[in-house]
């Protein structure tokens, strides 16, 4: 009888151990005096109000926590303010995980010294730095974080005059709106013209502003057949024929697009363009974003989605009313 009892207890213990192994024990994350617990077999987690402090020690704790969750595919941690450097170091270590977080990009503005840092959520549909000529610039290394922002449809990072490589735009091929104006080095240290090939992959692009951005070759734009608004003024563009097939164009600004002379391009070229895109209003008189460029329903939609007038208002993509 005693032997049977021992055997039964042994079997029961084994079963409990197997069940414990199968179900897994809870995994605990402790950072900054906060605790988060989840099951070992979790596939998606949301840290909620738990924030990961910006220290090597706390990010080491986060990594140790993630290492115990091999089935994870999604981690939301939007309460955590994470720098581009932290995200670009963390995310590649866990390629199977989609991270949802809030990226913090410092901003200095001599006219707005109280200006808070830029906040870019990885699930944002629209983002603008809302820069002006007094804002500090962010080069292309910062914008590598766009690879973790797959939902972006509208992007305004104009007035960033240290950007020399547009390769990061390959991460956001679904953009409908792109503003990259005034990205020419203001000190005149211009360097070679910028390759805009990534823009040619944006098949749904409708609004593009790239005036004064050290651009010479616009042949990639021939692929952007849905473009309605285009500003290419004050650049080094000699060949305008790539625009001939853009039948959706309704507004084209190209004053001084051949060079930085501040002069209109020859009337013969404008006429040739007009013959190919007869439904487009071509402006060869206003410099950069002057005159009617920042007027009309499309610009009003931009001002709303990018919160130009209300800097604290959340930014979100809004389609143009006349969008097909």
Question: What are the functions of these language-model segments?
Answer:
Residues 1-10:
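Bacterial N-terminal signal peptides that target proteins for export
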Residues 19-26:
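Sec-dependent signal peptide cleavage junction
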Residues 43-61, 71-82, 94-145, 151-164, ...:
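Concave beta-strand-loop units of leucine-rich repeat
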Residues 66, 90, 146, 169-170, ...:
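Hydrophobic anchor residues at the C-terminal helix/turn of individual leucine-rich repeat
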